[in-house]
Amino acid sequence: MKIVLVSRIDEADALRYTASLARELEGLGHEVALEEGTAAHLGEGGISFEEIDGDLVVVVGGDGSVLLTVHQMKKQVPVLGINWGEVGFLADLEPDEAGTFFAAHTEGFHIERRMRVSLSVNGVPLGDALNEGLVVTDRPAKMLRFGVYVDGTPAERFRADGLLVSTPTGSTAYAMSAGGPIVDPQIEGFLLVPLAPYMLSSRPHLISTGRNLEITLETEKPAHLVIDGQSTFELEKEATLTVKKSDQPALFVHTGKPFFEKVNHKLRNL
């Protein structure tokens, strides 16, 4: 197999581990390449995220590193995360588990698809999110007013500090911290979670991906859309955000660990 390695570059131990893993994988007969940022810190040549086109991408880092990799890849390639972060909901393996895992899976892996949301503003596509799109004011202590329309029907209007448009995968990220539910990633839906809403009646909504979902920014205050913490876009007043299911899901290696077992383990070890 052709395997591309990506490491967080702010941790020397992570880089050393990645270099060691590269040698181990080559010893198992795999063709190994390094992402160019990782390669530069190891004194090697590498390839850009946009050029990644192999059988597997191994990310040594936390959820942020995995999100960056998925966000930057031009073509979605199966990802396996090795946790070198705080929680690592998107990183299934611990560093000491990787060697055994690869030795036991020399012929291939079971791949799990995770839906992403495609976000556009006023008809202009801005990108896909694996975790969430965040609409937030750029002026602290100023609230925004939102209108939510499902199949053209007004479903909710509320004032809040911001709004999260999350995937089921993202339900264990910012959305969970904001009071949203944990959603089984096998469910395909759009999770809307208001941030500090003015009215207690403004609750999270889980909406089928089969419906047409639009969110209007009913305010003249400046706001921004942040996609997976990676890309930021300024929103015009009275902008309309259209949310659709992306036709390019993220691909992850399924390591055999049940989702709710992972959630229970990681939340108890925060």
Swiss-Prot record:
Top enzyme category: transferase
InterPro entries: ATP-NAD_kinase_N, ATP-NAD_kinase_PpnK-typ_C, NAD/diacylglycerol_kinase_sf, NADK
Gene Ontology MF: a single term: ATP binding
Keyword hit for Transit peptide: no
Locations listed in the record: Cytoplasm
Gene Ontology terms: cellular component: cytoplasm
Record bears the keyword Ribonucleoprotein: no
Binding locations of NAD(+): 63-64, 131-132, 142, 159, 161, 172-177, 196, 230
GO BP annotations, alphabetical order: NAD metabolic process; NADP biosynthetic process
Cofactor dependency: a divalent metal cation
Catalytic residue list: 63 (proton acceptor)
Catalytic activity: NAD(+) + ATP = ADP + NADP(+) + H(+)
SUPFAM superfamilies: NAD kinase/diacylglycerol kinase-like
Entry keywords, A to Z: ATP-binding, Cytoplasm, Kinase, NAD, NADP, Nucleotide-binding, Transferase
Catalytic activity, EC: 2.7.1.23
Role description: Involved in the regulation of the intracellular balance of NAD and NADP, and is a key enzyme in the biosynthesis of NADP. Catalyzes specifically the phosphorylation on 2'-hydroxyl of the adenosine moiety of NAD to yield NADP.
Family according to the record: Belongs to the NAD kinase family.
Name of the protein: NAD kinase
Organism per entry: Methanoculleus marisnigri (strain ATCC 35101 / DSM 1498 / JR1)
